[in-house]
Amino acid sequence: MSNHSEAYGSRDQRREKYTQGKEFEDGTLETLESIISAVEDETLSKDYQPLIVFFQRGFGAQLVQTWSYYAQVNNHGKFSKTTSLLTKTLRVLSSDTSTVTIGSGLIRLILTDYTKVLYRGLNNMRAQLTNPILRLLKQIVNFNNGQHIEELVSYFDFSLPILPRLLVPSKSELANGNSSADSSKHDSLRFTFIKFWLTLISNASPFVRKELLTENFKIMSNLFKFMNKADSDKLSEHILSVFINDILKEKSFKRTTKTKILNELAASKIHHFYYSSNKNLVKKANEFFLTFGASRDFSVAFPDNCVWFKNSVADGASHGAPITVNQVEFQIHNKLLFNTLRLFKPWEDTLQLGTLIKILENVPELVAPYSIFLTTNGNYDPKMTSYWFGITLLINKIINLKIPQFMEKVDSNIPPATSLVIENILPSLLTKSSLVKSLQFETPIIRQLACQSIVLALKKLEKVSTFYDQKGWRNEKTILLNEFHTRIPDLPIFVSTLSNSLASNKDNRILPLSISIIFNYYSKMFPNLFSINLPSSNIYTDIMQKSKISGIEFAILDNYLQFQEFNSTQTRWWNPSSGGNSLFTLLLKLASSKNASNVITTRISNLLDELTRTNVIFNISLISPVMALVNSLQGLSLQVSEIDNMEQVWKWFDETISRVVKTPYKYVDMAKEYNYISPFIMCLSEQWKYVDKSGNPEFLIKWLILFLRNMIFIGEDHIGIDKLVKNVFPEVSDHDVNIYLKLDSFEENIKKTNSSNSLISSMKSSSFFQYISALPSKNLMNISRLPVNKLDAAGILFRVQLLVEDDSVVYDNWFEATACELTGKIASYMVTDTEFPIIKVLERYINFALPKLAIEKRNALLMKKSRFMCNLIGAVCFETGHQLVEFREIIQKVVFSGENVEEYANYNELYQKEDVNAFLTSVSEYLSTSALTSLLMCSTKLESTRNILQKLFNEGKTIKISLVKNILNKAANEDPASIKEVNISLAKFFEENKVCVDASSDPMGKLSLSETTSLINSFVSSDLNYLVLKAFYRWEHFSFPSFIPSIWRIKDSPLLSIVTTAALFKHMQDKDFSAFAHETISKYGNEIAKSTYTTSKSEIFDEILNMITTYIDFYDETKRNEILKCVLSQSDHKYHAATVRYIAAHNNFTYPGVETWLHKTLLYLTKYLSERKVISNSFFELLRAMAELLKLEEVPNKLNVKIINSQLEAILGSEWIKQIKVLEYVIVLIFCVSKKSIQSQRMVQLLLSNDSYSSIMIKDNDEDSSYRKFLSTMILFSLFSIDPVVNSTPIVQEKLLTFYSGTISSNDKLILKILETIESHTATSWTNMIFSWEFIKDEEEEILEAIGDTRLITKEREGLILTLQKNMIKKSIDRYVLERPQVPELYTDSNTNNYDATTRCDLVKKYYDDTERSGVDMYDPLFLLLLIIHNKELVKMVKDDEGNVTYRYEFENFLDCKIFQFIICSLSDCHTVANISYEHLSNLASSLEKKTAQMNLEKQITSKDNERKESDSDLIKYNSIYQVLIKRILYQRQQNQDPINPLIWFSISRIVDLLGSPTAPLHEKAYRWVLSNSTIRSWDIPMVSDVMMSYNKRQQDDNKKEIDMEIYYGELSWVLTTICKGIKTDEDYKMLEKKGVFEWLLNLINMPYLKERLRELIYFIFYKVQRVADDGGLNLISRNGIVSFFEVLNNNIKSRLPQDDILNNIGTLRNENRGTLNTTLRLAQEQNGIEKLLLGYNELVKSQKRLILWTEGDSDNVVKRLRK
């Protein structure tokens, strides 16, 4: 009370003070109130002038003072009234632009000086006072669209304890619940505060909103706590809308932020709204959960890289949170969502059911644990309850979920966990016993639903089984099938259910259909276990004996016939029943009836196709003959008057099918006379004479003609059909034969075919096949209908075939367009029917395209059209991805001789070579590599040669040198332009070393003498081959000794001799070459010197000049000057790269005209870069040459400053800075001139304001992006360093911060250097501008990949947002780089007047190369360690009672974000970094001690709470072990013991992870290691010795051998990973060698069951040793015999690999067996790794004379053996 009295005076004093000011203040308030009322009352034009005058006179301040005074003297009525008046005033002031400024001033006055008045009103906790304050705050938020929100957040303390209390409803409100009247709720403190709070977070910027919601968790907790008890429906809807729109759909909020705000409490309270009587609220709650869990864009679901795997396929670890459901353990990434799903009761309403299924579909990892969770609700024994029906629907929908997309995309040799997969197929709730009970339940609906669940499970099993086959998981598939089989009822149960169903209700067809489907799937999935014994009288025999069958009965038969294949007894579908038809005929009846839908017709046709395929009934070359038969019968069904006579047809079919199945080869022999048409047609013709033709046989003739016509269209021989009709069917008139069955005059007969009495005419509207068959050719381009079945597509193929074979149809644009249009319709159809056999027509077109020499006449038109069709078929196969392998195989089989097509196979001698070339060229886009290379060997057209070479190059294929020789020989007399294009392509193959030798005796693979001689003979065939020859000399297999005997063969070829002389300059010591070179340089040097070089030879001027430049020292001064004079006089070549190179080599800038030439050349460069949109290759060459010239010592003094600055402006302000060669030139240009000459400030501004530079730094992510970023930043660094004082501005600093990534990359180091310089000149730190921190966890990495790179620093309106990535910190630990190059000093005092551009360029290049070798994928340690002290979540500022400021390290946060591990790892760094790390460790130790002491004190106070006591004890123990570890590290430093190797520090950083994972197998060992000693020992690598010794111990224990070995492999994996990632220095290598680790690793490789991943780790350890150890690990060669060890290992792998080229046969392997492909690729990968190691050791051996002697010179033989 005393404090209160001192602050406000006594009661009497306050009353007196109030009385004195009452009259004035009341008058002021009344005046304002009247003004506000007047403004609000006016409807049209509002007069704000009185209000403006009121505030201009200073009454605004008095108003606020009065308001504050009322609060002080506790005049509640006046205080409340004044608060409301302030609210109205602000609302009015916000309504007009003329008064907004006044309102802003009033708000700032309240926030800066009177926030305590706001607090006082809130603390009163009375609706009369508090509600007006909340409404005032709400108005401040709304003022001018949220203009003052940030000021409100800054000045107003939202951590006030009173704010959460405002959200606690009174007892009366809780008693009334949601049923209380809205008016009463509007007066509640909770309602008013929520309205203010929702308005605030809705209008706040995302960053402010995030801070409000995350920092004020007590407010949010109280808001959630009473949502379902006290809030009205309308308010609840508003709350949910804000949650959805402003939290979940806020794009800047990461998932961690959303889960931190909307936690389990929120989800549990919101779920109650599903049971609200307000439908709108229910919909809004459902919308919330759909967004919360099912939205791919906005949900809180973290990406899961396991799904059906127990551990991540990326790193073999599980990063999920452990949960236990019904005693089953899971590791999941979305624990919040799982706990949310547990709230749902999907069996109660469909809304919850639909939402739950969508969440499971979005987060498939939750399916397995949720399926187990369902078992906690009780068993699944059948009951006629709503719960049972609801849970059945839920289970069925779970089973129906698709295979997760992650699983579809994953490529892993490790199979998924069967326990997880089976829950997705058959959830545990569906136990075998419960299913049996359901199948035997007395109520049919229960039995049906049980069958439905099993059917869905079997369908899912089939899909997953196929998926396993695609992934190559064959062994795990067997385990999965066995597990599924044990969970479903036995077959006799289903048979019994089927029998009981028929006995109780014969008319019930639904349950028998379900059981038939089960039998069908069962027979497919478990063929060896499928065997059922049906009673003699069963539903299947009953249906087959019926005269008519319904659609559902057909479905039953369909399934029955399919599973009969696997049953012991086969159904004789071809035999007619007594007094009835055969099943074959019955199905034809059903398919061809008027009432049959397209789906039924297609399904029956497919079924009959399957039945007839195993018998010799139709020719296999036909496309769906049964569908053609059905289509003809459908035509008869349209003839209503003839239906009564159909029995004749059905009997005819019965006899035909019965006989053709029983004696098929009889009819095959009969067909010989008729070009081997189908046996079915032959039997049909045989039975024709027995058909009853009494009455009206015309309809039979009509059908017969239609059927035979259909058969011709799908591939039956039309000549054989014509002959058969004439011999066997005399009733068919010649007129009908000519119209319907003759193809010679097809186009003429179409009009007659379309007559009104034709069956075809009547079928056109219902059958696409008949429509396309009767369409005139001119209308084929305008088809709007699409094929819907195989017969329709076959009809299209036949019409195309007619166009091809019709000689009256010329090959023109119309033909091409029509063929493309029709083939395109087939391609669109094949999207849905991948098995359509388009490939069947290919051979026919190939036969047309390749007439045989001895037999067939050449028809050029037919050949050309057929080649085009082959190309279209290849395009369809390629685009649809189906039958491409078959396409290639057919072509190779026909075209090439022999069964196996090897490279350069010979053509089939039956065909003309020119025809084969033309044919293969037409389909070259779709041929295999072997076929293409064979084509290149024989083809003569250079255009196709160029295209094929380009295709092979783009696909990364290699070609043989013999192919190059062949192409050069064939191109000798072709068009020069074509030759040049082909030569450019060939040169690329040489430059990329994609040309291999055919045969070589040289162990290093060099070209032999005979091969070189032969190739030189090909080169001299044309002078234009100089491009290939130039690349040939740089080829890795080029051998100078093999070449020199043939050198004089190129003497007479000017370009070839010039190129040879220039390229082989280094071989001038060879006598023969020296003589050749002197003759060449003398001849062409004299010609140029005398200016006698003719214009006709000007095309080789540049090559001559390049040669002269190379040999410039061989000319005297006079001759050089003569050549220079000639060069300067050549206007056509003055600005060529060759000219620049010669002038640079001549290096005489005092020669008349050279300086002028230099200025003009620079002007030419500026003009070119300013005007051109595209840069040519020749200009890039010019830039490169100019860059070399500018490095010369004399050049800087000759440069014109204005020209240089204008050129820099032209480049730095344009898009050319994206070109690496341009950037390299600019760097040289900057380095070669005086610092004072460049306008650095302008250039810096130009570069930083260039959008292209921003794009380079932020967006570029291609293979050259790193070098491009470095060059552009180096330019900026150089320009900045010219005048750092002037360039050190806040704008430059802010722009650079957005480009900085905080890594050790070369460009980041340059940016950091600039930032340090700016800070030193401005004396302000950029860290003061940090507004917020973001920390991205592992789970959000997938989002980053989707939205692109997340910058370390981003600029927002509020300030800088700094984002750290946990994954990046982990990478920084794993790839910690110790040797990091420093930024070179380019402008120091020592070289201020020394403009040696060459030295600077060399320094820059060396810096980049060294940095790239060290790796860039890690944070800069110094930057990160200094930055973390500014993060409040890591280091908090704490004030004690006396006001002293201390800093507390939040250890748990350090641990969680991996920075603690990073600190330990950085102890191996330089002294500066290590000292900072030790300082951090000291502070962490101090903070841990204080926290432990505080927890002990709290533990004593709250010891009565046993649960808390136990958890606190665990936490104390948890912190204590880290304290011990930190003290060990600090003690080691204190004792100044031996330095600790980086490998040990890295191992300790990994120990930290084990200490925090109690379930990890190595946790206990890690714990013991920490407690084992008081210091860190320089030779003690954690865990290594234990694991090395534990193998033998485990082998001795036979009882636990299997279990322990599995644990051992886990421990081994940890140790190998630690060594692999941690070995960084030669000291690490020596330490491992002393401990015998390498010998142990070699022994491990011989372990028979060592996992592939562990084997790869061992190989990589040796790979790193070769590069880390100072001597490369030579002792491993001499002491451990590692070379011979790996060579034996390599030979073993070779023997297990296929002999063919693996890369060129991947497609074949993939189609044959995915498992075989995976095995082969794994072996190939292992072999590749071993060969790399052997090549490395070979280089080490050759570097030591002692080892060369020790190995007796066998190193080259090792390489030779590898190349065999």
Swiss-Prot record:
This protein's name: Nucleolar pre-ribosomal-associated protein 1
Assembly notes: Associates with pre-60S ribosomal particles. Predominantly associated with the 27SA2 pre-rRNA. Can associate with a subset of box H/ACA and box C/D small nucleolar RNPs (snoRNPs) required for peptidyl transferase center modification and with small RNAs snR37 and snR42. Interacts with URB2. Together with DBP6, NOP8, URB2 and RSA3, forms an RNA-independent complex, which is required during early maturation of nascent 60S ribosomal subunits.
Region Disordered, annotated ranges: 1-23
Localization (cell): Nucleus, Nucleolus
The keyword Nucleus belongs to this UniProt entry's keyword annotation: yes
Note: Present with 5890 molecules/cell in log phase SD medium.
GO molecular function list: mRNA binding
Alphabetical list of Pfam families matching this protein: NopRA1, Npa1
Gene responsible for this protein: URB1
Keywords noted in UniProt: Nucleus, Ribosome biogenesis, rRNA processing
A biological-process GO annotation: maturation of LSU-rRNA from tricistronic rRNA transcript (SSU-rRNA, 5.8S rRNA, LSU-rRNA)
Function, as annotated: Required for 60S ribosomal subunit formation and pre-rRNA processing. Required for normal accumulation of 25S and 5.8S rRNAs.
